[in-house]
């Protein structure tokens, strides 16, 4: 039954991607200054929005774990964060490719890019930290505390272009057909995120079931 | 009457392994409970939960009806664990006044000096702990644990590896404490010393409470009796 | 008020213990002076004024790490941490006491480093002295709070030595960047302008948020 939902969502995502790619590649015109390259924005921007959304959820569930002690919040925290890190990497890579083509540089140390890189390092650190603790309860507790600290960087990434002058472009107004494409692609990515989270959650639940059975076996 | 120390259906897991299972235990005020068991039976784990260092995986513990982590409760509990819990870089006197301050002891300098006298360390009050012999460190640890006049004492294998002088000091201090109606829970392998002090006995075997009751005459005359009767085969 | 009394008791205890053993503080001073000397040797004088802010805070961060990493780990021998957790001492008081002690030790290292910098780089750095001192305190507090907190977070981990640097530096980066920018500007003798005030507000905000978070979470992290 759980599998069915994943397959349905998967099919929906596939359809959406086909539709979106068609629109992005064929329907939309070349942008005035950037030519064809700007089309990567339709993946770059929603990837970061998705990652930000996922990390906010992870921050909240980490707080909920510390408040209630229920292991399901820990399972959600790790699943959501892992998927978020994947989207962070997509966001970084697409951004760097765009920058190389448009500005001629792979990287610059402006506020947005620096805080974004810190974000990747922090949540990567979260995953490494989890790997380093064997006891499930300690792991949940320590990583939840770390997740909350890491989350402080997320608003910094978001507001960095408002607070400082950055190389990274400022928010701009877009013609409606571009907004539409952007939002449709975001929908596809959100559904993809949900699929990955569900799969990871299921894996985490199975792991806990196995742990529970092992405990039972030891207790007998 | 509120139990001095109580455990209600306590479970504790280390990873997969259940270190404690279904522990239901109540210790009356003024009694002395000897907690027995082989190594790995769960004695230290249970004491750590009573002391508030760990939280039970399932179930709860209470000290005088309140949570073990409560600040007021912590003020009334004295702990003597495996480590001596005093600072090597500080002097004996500095260590005791430090803990005196943390526990809010009135007139902590005098109390510290009195305790140094009692454990026979007055003459080295300004010596740094790192210079002390093992026996001296252990006696300082005893002073630290009892300094704030606790009503509940949790002692994890307190007689292990003590020299004769330290054992004598500890026995005197514990008897005085019992005379003042303190409650003591101590885990031990030293059955003879334990049986002399204990009013009640509990035996842990593989995380379960195998026996809990008053100390009987048989236990006093043959300390190994309990293990033979209720321990693992 | 018992809270503050206990906080200062812990701070005094840490300072006394550190000043007697001098393990971390000696390493910290030596590291700081060595790096400053080496960089003075390696780079042309004119270039070093430009990089002064960055250089000084890299030195402070790494010299500081030598002190901060030991913060809670120093309680492990003799099981002293257990005694502190068992005492009627709020974990936040324990944390704050240690953070204050660390702050004082680090400020001592900085107080020596700045004049050394002035001498070996032939730099005039006292133009905006009081503002610079304020930035030094704010920046140092920021990364002290983080270092002390993460020392608590990792104290019971098997892989503490490996994990701590890995986790701590990314979190410190925003604070260090702000301090670097501000220090570089102030060493040049210029008062803070609007652009720099953004960094100043950022630094203050960083300090407030992480101090609050650390005080809130330290109890959860120490009791297993």
Task: Please tell me what each predicted stretch does.
Chain B
Residues 153-157:
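Catalytic Walker B motif of ABC-type/P-loop ATPase nucleotide-binding domains
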Residues 97, 101-124:
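Conserved ABC ATPase "signature" region
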Residues 51:
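Helix-to-loop junction immediately C-terminal to a conserved catalytic motif
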Residues 164-166:
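Helix N-cap at the start of a conserved alpha-helix in ABC-type nucleotide-binding domains
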Residues 59-73, 211-213:
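Conserved ABC transporter NBD signature motif
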């Amino acid at each position: 039954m759980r599998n069915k939902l994943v397959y349905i969502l998967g099919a929906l995502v596939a359809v959406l991607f086909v539709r979106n790619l068609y629109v992005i590649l064929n329907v939309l015109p070349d942008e005035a200054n950037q030519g064809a390259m700007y089309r990567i924005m339709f993946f770059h921007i929603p990837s970061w929005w998705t990652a930000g959304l996922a990390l906010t959820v992870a921050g909240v569930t980490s707080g909920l774990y510390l408040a209630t002690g229920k292991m399901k919040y820990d399972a959600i925290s790790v699943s959501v964060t892992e998927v978020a890190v994947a989207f962070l990497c997509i966001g970084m890579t697409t951004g760097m490719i765009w920058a190389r083509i448009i500005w001629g540089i792979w990287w610059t140390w402006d506020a947005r890019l620096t805080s974004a890189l810190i974000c990747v390092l922090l949540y990567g650190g979260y995953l490494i930290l989890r790997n380093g603790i064997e006891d499930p309860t300690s792991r949940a507790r320590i990583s939840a505390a770390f997740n909350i600290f890491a989350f402080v960087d997320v608003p910094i990434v978001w507001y960095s272009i408002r607070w400082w002058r950055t190389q990274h472009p400022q928010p701009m107004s877009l013609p409606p057909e571009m907004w539409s494409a952007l939002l449709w692609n975001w929908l596809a990515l959100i559904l993809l995120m949900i699929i990955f989270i569900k799969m990871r959650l299921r894996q985490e639940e199975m792991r806990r079931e196995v742990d529970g059975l092992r405990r039972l076996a030891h207790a007998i | 009457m509120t139990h001095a120390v109580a455990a209600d259906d306590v479970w504790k897991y280390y990873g997969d392994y259940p270190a404690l299972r279904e522990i239901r235990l109540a210790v009356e005020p003024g009694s002395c409970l000897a907690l027995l068991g082989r190594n790995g039976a769960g004695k230290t784990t249970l004491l750590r939960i009573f002391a508030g260092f760990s939280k039970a995986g399932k179930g709860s513990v209470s000290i005088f009806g309140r949570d073990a982590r409560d600040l007021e409760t912590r003020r009334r509990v004295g702990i003597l664990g495996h480590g001596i819990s005093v600072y090597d870089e500080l002097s004996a006197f500095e260590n005791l006044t430090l803990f005196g301050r943390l526990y809010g002891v009135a007139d902590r300098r005098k109390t510290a000096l009195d305790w140094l006298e009692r454990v026979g360390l007055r003459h080295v009050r300004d010596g740094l702990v790192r210079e002390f012999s093992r026996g001296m460190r252990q006696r300082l640890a005893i002073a630290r644990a009892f300094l704030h006049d606790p009503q509940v004492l949790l002692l994890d294998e307190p007689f292990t590896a003590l020299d004769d002088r330290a054992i004598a000091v500890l026995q005197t201090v514990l008897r005085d404490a019992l005379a003042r109606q303190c409650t003591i829970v101590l885990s031990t392998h030293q059955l003879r010393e334990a049986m002399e002090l204990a009013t009640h006995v509990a035996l842990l075997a593989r995380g379960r409470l195998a026996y809990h009751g008053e100390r009987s005459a048989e236990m006093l005359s043959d300390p190994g009796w309990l293990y033979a009767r209720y321990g693992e085969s | 008020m018992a809270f503050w009394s206990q906080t200062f008791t812990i701070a005094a205890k840490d300072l006394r213990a550190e000043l007697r053993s001098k393990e971390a503080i000696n390493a910290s001073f030596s590291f700081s002076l060595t790096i400053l000397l080496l960089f003075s040797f390696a780079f042309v004088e004119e270039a070093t004024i430009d990089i002064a802010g960055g250089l000084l805070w890299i030195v402070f961060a790494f010299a500081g790490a030598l002190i901060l990493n030991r913060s809670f780990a120093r309680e492990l021998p003799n099981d002293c941490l257990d005694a502190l957790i068992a005492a009627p001492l709020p974990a936040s008081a324990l944390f704050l006491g240690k953070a204050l002690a660390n702050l004082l030790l680090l400020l001592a290292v900085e107080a020596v480093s700045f004049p050394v910098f002035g001498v070996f780089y032939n730099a005039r750095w006292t133009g905006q002295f009081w503002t610079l001192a304020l930035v030094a305190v704010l920046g140092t507090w920021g990364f002290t709070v983080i270092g002390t907190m993460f020392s608590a977070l990792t104290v019971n981990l098997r892989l503490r030595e490996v994990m701590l640097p890995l986790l701590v530096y990314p979190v410190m980066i925003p604070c260090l960047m702000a301090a670097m920018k501000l220090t570089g500007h102030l060493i040049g003798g210029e008062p803070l302008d609007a652009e720099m005030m953004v960094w100043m507000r950022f630094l203050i905000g960083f300090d407030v948020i992480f101090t609050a978070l650390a005080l809130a979470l330290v109890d959860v992290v120490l009791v297993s």
